[in-house]
């Protein structure tokens, strides 16, 4: 239908502009844009992940969110963990990661998000979120320029965090580590 085609074109344009920005961010050595670091609650960060996971489900993926180290009340209380982050950079990072899952991920296996809380809050404490999925067989040997991952890695570093990728021909895992601040 006409509306479906319009939505597809809108998505195509968004992806193209995202790619242009990513190329500029990764390869431009001039001064990067200013970031706006603000206190970001754990529940707010998880809300961004949940939105993306919900979108995957609408696209036909199976998802699972697992927090083995945390009681749900630990996550939703107002004084739960806080990170310092730029909300827009967080959204960009998640858009990159989840668009890769949409493009390369297999709908036959579950996409999982797991979280590891730091045992104690100190200067080295980090909140780790791991996103795992199986790669579609037809994409297992596809070469990519990894611009989105490079951009996401750089954005995590700009916020004082870290992004680590582990990948095989059939499996993809990315771990985001955010420095934690005391409530």
Identify what each model region corresponds to.
Residues 125-147:
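Glycine-rich/acidic phosphate-handling loop/turn and adjacent ATP-lid/helix
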Residues 101-102:
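Short helix-loop "hinge" at the ATP-lid/N-box region of the Bergerat-fold HATPase_c
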């Amino acid at each position: 239908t006409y509306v479906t085609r319009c939505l597809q074109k809108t998505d195509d344009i968004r992806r193209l502009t995202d790619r242009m920005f990513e190329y500029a961010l990764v390869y431009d050595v001039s001064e990067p844009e200013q970031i706006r670091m603000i206190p970001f609650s754990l529940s707010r960060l998880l809300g961004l992940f949940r939105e993306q996971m919900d979108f995957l489900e609408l696209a036909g993926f199976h998802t699972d969110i697992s927090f083995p180290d945390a009681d749900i009340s630990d996550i939703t209380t107002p004084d739960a963990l806080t990170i310092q982050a730029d909300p827009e950079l967080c959204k960009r990072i998640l858009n990159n990661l989840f668009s890769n899952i949409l493009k390369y991920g297999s709908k036959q296996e579950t996409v999982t998000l797991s979280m590891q809380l730091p045992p104690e809050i100190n200067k080295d404490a980090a909140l780790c979120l791991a996103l795992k999925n199986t790669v579609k067989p037809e994409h297992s040997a596809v070469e990519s320029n990894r611009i989105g991952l490079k951009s996401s890695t750089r954005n995590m570093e700009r916020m004082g965090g870290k992004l680590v990728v582990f990948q095989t021909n059939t499996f993809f895992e990315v771990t985001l580590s955010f420095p934690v601040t005391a409530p």
